[in-house]
Every structure is written in structure tokens, then in C-alpha cells.
A protein has these predicted regions:
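Conserved radical SAM core fold
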Residues: 79, 123, 148-151, 169-187, ...
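Auxiliary Fe-S-binding modules of radical SAM enzymes
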Residues: 1-23, 202-308
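Non-cysteine beta-strand/loop elements that form the S-adenosyl-L-methionine
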Residues: 159-174, 246-252
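Hydrophobic faces of well-ordered beta-strands that scaffold small-molecule active sites
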Residues: 59, 114, 142-144, 165-167, ...
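Anionic-ligand binding region
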Residues: 177-209
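Short glycine-enriched, charge-decorated loop/helix-capping segments at active-site entrances
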Residues: 77-91, 179-184, 262-271
């Protein structure tokens, strides 16, 4: 799959750069390897992903760089085009062999699944890494944890590799995608990507412990002043997929005024008002969703943002 790096069109930006020659596109990734910021057992994903056993959790692989530029991103230390070594000193370059071993190590630590966070731009490394790990004893579901800024073609390449899609749907309009993530086409491409995900994995399947072993979880982080958009997204999802997917409606927006560009969006300098989230939660409740997660409380503290 290295040819996918020589003219990179893995995400909707279709930069077309030759990463094998050391050229970087929008995301900043180069070479034929994956850059991994951290591997860990993660206890704070949705319960059907992380489980409730304190000795287990989701076997999470955090990849460096990102195809979006979310102005409110909590992980800017590892998501930027150029990484700051002082803030992310432990980033490792991994080929398919070393990445497959990382998956096996997480399985040995008791992970419920292998959770690939921000993986889009490393797809040509991930697919053979999963295959190699399975040849060497990996028996866990593979979770593709994505921003939703994907092409249907890239998702199609993951058929047979991914069991669970954990996918954001961030925005309802092109204007919001452009303003907050430098992605005016986000609201267009995400729906085609989700449709391909559903074509592959179908309705949710749970094991006897309530752990998801196949299916789709759609996340939506409710942003300040965007409750209308949140309801539109949830409504469209329900109209198309009904109770065949898991809905995760998040109330954890955290203002980070120190992030570059944040001052241009005063609405994002405030936490989500409780009544805004309640409006969205009430709308979801009226739909009688069978599989849905709602969050109580307020924005997460910066102390919960990982140290890289």
C-alpha cells in the first residue's frame, strides 16, 4: 500500500504530495511509517468500548498529526502539522511490524479492543499491521476512532480490517467546518463516509457483557451556541440509521483560550451552557434512542487532557 503515500489522497484534502520523498501535505505526516504519540489502556471511552472493569479498558493508540485544524483541539501538542518536541517528546516512528507488536502488547495488558485514534493518514501502515497482528494471535475488535473527515474510498479500503467505527460528526454546515476546523467540505463528506462504514459493519452487535464487538458509534460534541446543529445531526442520523447505531452526545467541551486562533471565536471561549445541552438531550430522549450515551456535568478539566 506504499503507493498510497507517493500521491497522498487518503483524506478529502487530496494534497497529492509524495510522502515517500519527505514531502508533507496539510496533516504534516511524511514517510512510509506511522508516528505514534502514545499507547495506553484507556478507561474513559464510551462504556461499550472501555468497559467497566478497572483492570481492563480500550487498548488505545494515539497517532500524531491530523487532517483537521480544530481551533478548540485539546491535543494540539500532537495534532499539528509540525510537532513540538518539548510538548510531545515520546512520539515514535512505527512500521507495520512494530505497530502490530504494539497491538499485541495492548492485548496482553487486558485491552477489550484496539482503538486507533486519528488514524486516517496512516491507513497504509495500519491495514498490514492489523493483518500481521492477527497472524500472530490478535483476537480483539479493531476500533477506527476518527474525526469523520474521511473519503468513502479510504473507508472502503478498511473493509475486513475494522470491526467498530467510532466516528465524530462535528458540524452541520460548511461555514462551521471552515471556521472551526479549516474544512469547508466537512459537512458534505462525513455523511458519505458514515454510509460506507454502515455498509461494511451493519447494525451494532454486543457481547454478553454489553461490549460492542461490531458496529458504529457516532459521537457529537455539543458546542456553545450550536444546539440547533446538534439536533439536526441527531435527527438525520436517526432518520437514516434508527436504532442500528450507538449515539454518543457529549457535554465535555473545554474552552482553551490559549489555543492559536481561539480569540477569533468569542463564542468558543465559554463552556457549554447547561440549558443548551439539556435541549439536545431532551430532543434525543424524545426519539427514544435504544443505544445512546448522554453526559452529566460540565466541561472536563485540563487535568484530564493526556500528557504526551
Amino acid at each position: 500500500m506504499d503507493n498510497l503515500f507517493s500521491n497522498c489522497t487518503l483524506c478529502p484534502r487530496a494534497c497529492g504530495v509524495n510522502r515517500l520523498a519527505g514531502k508533507a501535505g496539510f496533516c504534516g505526516a511524511v514517510g512510509s511509517y506511522a508516528e505514534v504519540a502514545k499507547t495506553m489502556i484507556h478507561h474513559w471511552e464510551e462504556p461499550c468500548i472501555s468497559g467497566k472493569d478497572p483492570d481492563r479498558g480500550s487498548g488505545t493508540v494515539f497517532f500524531a498529526h491530523c487532517t483537521l485544524r480544530c481551533v478548540y483541539c485539546q491535543n494540539q501538542a500532537i495534532s499539528g502539522r509540525v510537532l513540538d518536541a518539548s510538548k510531545a517528546p515520546n512520539v515514535r516512528k512505527m512500521d507495520a511490524s512494530s505497530l502490530s507488536q504494539a497491538f499485541l502488547d495492548l492485548q496482553h495488558q487486558g485491552a477489550h479492543n484496539i482503538n486507533l485514534v486519528t488514524p486516517t493518514h496512516y491507513l497504509p501502515v495500519i491495514v498490514p499491521a492489523v493483518a500481521l497482528a492477527c497472524e500472530n494471535g490478535l483476537q480483539l475488535p479493531i476500533v477506527y476512532n476518527t474525526s469523520g473527515y474521511e473519503t468513502a474510498e479510504a473507508i472502503h479500503r478498511l473493509a475486513g480490517t475494522v470491526d467498530i467505527y467510532l466516528c465524530d460528526i462535528k458540524y452541520w454546515t460548511a461555514q462551521t467546518g471552515k471556521a472551526y476546523s479549516m474544512a469547508p467540505d466537512y459537512a458534505g463528506v462525513v455523511w458519505a463516509a458514515v454510509e460506507e462504514m454502515f455498509r461494511q459493519v451493519g447494525p451494532c452487535v454486543f457481547d454478553e457483557h454489553g461490549m460492542l464487538i461490531k458496529g458504529i458509534v457516532i459521537r457529537h460534541l455539543v458546542l456553545p451556541g450550536r444546539s440547533y446543529a446538534a439536533k439536526k445531526i441527531i435527527g438525520r442520523l436517526f432518520q437514516r440509521y434508527g436504532n442500528n447505531i450507538v449515539y454518543s452526545i457529549m457535554n465535555q467541551y473545554t474552552p482553551l483560550p490559549e489555543n492559536p486562533g481561539m480569540q477569533a471565536f468569542p463564542e468558543l471561549l465559554n463552556s457549554l451552557a447547561p440549558e443548551e445541552y439539556e435541549e439536545v438531550a431532551d430532543y434525543a430522549a424524545a426519539l427514544d434512542l435504544e443505544y445512546a450515551y448522554l453526559q452529566e456535568g460540565e466541561a472536563i478539566s485540563e487535568s484530564f487532557i493526556p500528557m504526551w
